[in-house]
Amino acid sequence: MASPRTITIMALSVALGLFFVFMGTIKLTPRLSKDAYSEMKRAYKSYVRALPLLKKMGINSILLRKSIGALEVACGIVMTLVPGRPKDVANFFLLLLVLAVLFFHQLVGDPLKRYAHALVFGILLTCRLLIARKPEDRSSEKKALPESAEEQPSLYEKAPQGKVKVS
């Protein structure tokens, strides 16, 4: 049977991957939701207006929206279907992307309810990455503890003669 750690990583990977495939698809095409697509177009126009450096670099709102959407779809597919280290790389890229989106929301002065989902999914991506990168076997770090009180040396045996060790 799979360990709880493995099940947690798999569940987070699939859920996060599907979410980012969905959100990336909304940024790329109006087929899923015309309202959400038009809202994304409006939001990305405000992001480019708020950050003139993007315009100077030749990045318009369409290019920014489609680039972010394509990256979300690609990383979401990797998170959902590809095993091993590529999941961690996709997780890292999505985490950077979420941080950029949070920056954009703060830049244009959006209220918390407009970017709360980005905060939540950023936290979930961070948790998944921390759980996945944590070493599997921690038993080597733990010392074997005596099982009964008879096996444990008393404080009097550990302390020098005539002194009691107080901890």
Swiss-Prot record:
Residues 135-145 have a biased composition (Basic and acidic residues). GO terms for biological process: chaperone-mediated protein complex assembly; positive regulation of protein localization to cell surface. The chain crosses the membrane at residues 6-26, 62-82, 89-109, 115-132. Residues 27-61, 110-114 are lumenal. It is found in: Peroxisome membrane; Cytoplasmic vesicle; Endoplasmic reticulum membrane. Residues 43-54 are annotated as: Interaction with NGFR. One of its GO terms (molecular function) is acetylcholine receptor regulator activity. Disruption phenotype: Mice show a complete disruption of the assembly and function of the neuronal acetylcholine receptor (nAChR) subunit alpha-7 (CHRNA7) in the brain. Exhibit enhanced locomotor activity, profound abnormalities in spatial/working memory and a significant reduction of assembled nAChRs in the brain. Display thermal hyperalgesia and mechanical allodynia accompanied by an increased number of microglia in the spinal cord dorsal horn. Exhibit elevated basal serum corticosterone accompanied by increased anxiety-like behavior and an impairment of long-term memory. The keyword Chaperone applies. It comes from the Eukaryota. Residues 1-5, 83-88, 133-167 are cytoplasmic. Molecular chaperone which mediates the proper assembly and functional expression of the nicotinic acetylcholine receptors (nAChRs) throughout the brain. Essential for the proper folding, assembly, function and surface trafficking of alpha-7 (CHRNA7), alpha-4-beta-2, alpha-3-beta-2 and alpha-3-beta-4 receptors. Stably associates with ribophorin-1 (RPN1) and ribophorin-2 (RPN2) (components of the oligosaccharyl transferase (OST) complex) and with calnexin (CANX), both of which are critical for NACHO-mediated effects on CHRNA7 assembly and function. PANTHER family: NOVEL ACETYLCHOLINE RECEPTOR CHAPERONE, SPINAL CORD EXPRESSION PROTEIN 4. Belongs to the DoxX family. This is Novel acetylcholine receptor chaperone. It comes from Mus musculus (Mouse).
